[in-house]
A protein has these predicted regions:
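Beta-propeller domains
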Residues: 1-526
Length: 526
């Protein structure tokens, strides 16, 4: 296997036109923005973890059947400081940066003191968030960076803490039909409380307040939930929403705040301060968006680690929600760069395969129901919710599928009953090998794969005016040419006709230029 992990990627600052063989649907117009780690070595210093790398923004502009690609490193304060010093000087979650050994004792002492209550990185490498007409690169700290979606220039630095009291925030917000943003963050020991904060960013700013103001600066707290532990809040990567409720999992994968505060002095990374407790429970919080208060019943399930919520909706008095769950936290450990060697695909094995699980949570619990009775009356799932003697409810999921990650849906169905999931297939190795379309109703799937291809998170773009959830108009063509990828390519764009998963366009970029290939095939790899 060609070693690509840990190599610094070269920017493509000016748009380069891709060669298209075949045709792109005429209605597909716009710009796809991607974000992720691109630089893992600065001078002689190296990051420890794949998800520590400096953010590289990617842009695929599709206009009238043509594709243009460009990429640019996010000009964060972190990036600039590291490049100017020619070494890593800003700590990331898996890599602790230390002062220059040439500094005097007073400078070193100040560095140790400042890291006790750290100012986190603005290396926003996880996702892109849209707020009104603005676009932001995001990570899981309190910082986001505004970017120009056309040029990929880095603009304003925004600190969530100026508007809502959060030290950490997710990179997977939700959007309502009006374009308002709903997100979650953790507030650590604020006024004696550690809490999970749900906050809302309006899509537009009132006319009287528009001057010089962006929607983010009008963020407001929607609801807060007290952490079960003051100094060990739960880690979470995403959450779920229905039309009337928010779904939050307080899982036993936790941050130890005291250990984080002393990590710098102890010579360890912040990531080492996370731990999974197999003896603890996963608590399910259901928040009513109308009252802005949690449903009072205590719901819980077995210990698990969830990074991605898929979707949630209401049916017959229950909230049904789907997540990708693990039995432990081994996934994060596998992406330390020391483990990403040439034998990574063959030797790296998860101790828990990611499973698609459906939970059903009853919104109204009958006080007269017998202890041990199943409170779920929904016929579409085998998930159960068992009443216990103390009034708590133990939820057991229905396992829908084993071996998928990076789930996406037709977002028009977010918070509503839905049928299809588009994801990357992941078995015991953390490397995705196939793109998968899963049908929840029939429990069947369609798959696509190609040799030496690692598919990333898919994105569903519905047909304009589509009536069906998976409606895309393009159909296979027998006359389209095929050109293989360059051996050293590291960036690809695939365009698929989803009902059949039969048409793929791939854009590759390397030092020899960029190519887009549209491949139309008659058969699938099952």
């Amino acid at each position: 296997m060609e070693i690509i992990f840990g190599q610094n990627k070269i920017e493509q600052l000016e748009p380069v036109q891709a060669k298209v063989t075949g045709s792109i649907p005429a209605w597909l117009q716009g710009t796809l923005l991607r974000n992720g780690p691109g630089m893992h070595t600065v001078g002689e210093s190296k990051y420890n973890h794949w998800f520590d790398g400096l953010a590289l923004l990617h842009s695929f502009s599709i206009r009238d059947g043509e594709v243009f690609y460009r990429s640019k490193y996010l000009q964060s304060d972190t990036y600039i400081a590291n490049i100017e010093a020619n070494r890593i000087v800003v700590s990331e979650f898996g890599t602790m940066a230390y002062p220059d050994p040439c500094k005097n004792i007073f400078s070193k002492a100040f560095s140790y003191l400042s890291h006790t209550i750290p100012d986190f990185t603005d290396n926003c490498l996880i996702n892109i968030m849209k707020c009104g007409e603005d676009f932001y690169a995001t990570t899981e700290t309190n910082y986001i960076r505004k970017i120009d979606p056309q040029t990929l220039e880095t603009l304003e630095k925004v600190d969530y803490r100026k508007y809502v009291a959060v030290n950490l925030a997710t990179s997977h917000p939700h959007y309502d039909e009006a374009g308002n943003v709903l997100n979650m963050g953790t507030s650590v020991v604020d006024k004696g409380r550690t809490k999970y904060v749900i906050f809302k960013i309006p899509a537009t700013v009132p006319d009287s307040k528009k001057k010089g103001k962006s929607p983010v600066k009008h963020a407001e707290v929607f609801c807060s939930i007290s952490s079960r532990s003051l100094l060990s809040p739960s880690y979470y990567h995403s959450f779920g929403v229905t039309e009337n409720y928010v779904v939050f999992l307080e899982q036993p994968f936790k941050l130890d705040i005291l250990k984080m505060a002393t990590a710098y002095m102890r010579g360890v990374s912040w990531a080492s301060c996370m731990s999974f407790n197999r003896e603890d429970k996963t608590y399910i919080h259901i928040i009513d968006q109308r009252t802005r208060k949690p449903v009072p019943t205590k719901f819980y399930t077995d210990p698990m680690v969830v990074f991605h919520h898929v979707n949630a909706y209401e049916e017959d008095g229950c909230v049904l929600f789907d997540v990708i769950a693990y039995e432990d936290s081994s996934l994060y450990q596998l992406f330390y760069l020391a483990n990403l060697n040439k034998d990574f695909e063959e030797k790296s094995r998860l101790t828990s395969v990611p499973t698609l699980r459906r939970f059903a949570v009853p919104l109204h619990v009958d006080k007269d129901a017998e202890v041990g009775s199943n409170l779920v009356k929904v016929s579409s799932t085998t998930a159960t919710a068992l009443k216990e003697k103390d009034g708590h409810v133990y939820c057991q999921p229905e396992v829908l599928y084993e071996g998928l990650e990076l789930p996406r849906i037709n977002y028009a169905y977010n918070g509503k009953p839905y049928r299809y999931i588009f994801a990357a297939e992941v078995q015991w190795s953390p490397v995705p090998t196939k793109i998968l379309k899963y049908d929840i109703l029939t429990k069947s799937s369609l798959k696509w794969s190609e040799e030496s291809c690692w598919p990333a998170e898919p994105l569903f773009v519905p047909t304009p005016g589509a009536k069906d959830e998976d409606d895309v108009p393009c159909r296979p063509s027998r006359d389209c040419g095929v050109q293989g990828p360059h051996r050293k390519s590291h960036c690809q764009l695939s365009i698929a006709c989803v009902p059949e998963i039969s048409a793929f366009g791939r854009q590759t970029e390397d030092n020899q230029g960029s190519t887009v290939i549209l491949r139309y095939t008659e058969n699938l790899n099952y």
